C-alpha cells in the first residue's frame, strides 16, 4: 500500500490548496476531485475538529482572558473566531479590539454590544445575536 500511495503522490502531486486539474475540475490533496466527489461527512468532521482545535489553541495563546471564560462563553468566542478567521488569509477576529477589551474585564454586556456593533454582525445576522446572547448570559441560546 505504501508503494501505491507514494506512486500516486508522485503522479498526482500533493496540493494543499484547491486547484483546477487538466480538465478544469476543482481538485485538492492527492487528486481529490471536489467537483464530482466532494468530501464525506466523516472527512468534513475531521477537518472541523482540526480547525476548531487550532482556533481554541490560538485563542488560549493569544488572549489570556479566554481561559477565564465559562465553557459557554468560550464556545461563543470560538464560534465567532472560527467564522471571522484568526491567522490565515485575511483574519478579522484580531480586529475586534473593543470586544476583546470588554471580555478581558468580564464586562459581558459591553462585549455583547461591541460584538453586535460590527459589519460582521450585519453580515451573519442571527448567528451574531445568538453568540452575543451566549456571551452576555453565559447560557446556550
Describe every region a protein language model picked out.
Residues 54-93:
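Active-site nucleophile-His-acid catalytic modules used for acyl/amide transfer and hydrolysis
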Residues 37-38, 67:
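Helix-turn-helix-type domain boundary/helix-start signal
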Residues 22-25, 74:
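A structure-centric signal for secondary-structure junctions around beta-strands
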Residues 2-17, 23, 32-37, 43-50, ...:
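Long, amphipathic alpha-helical surface segments
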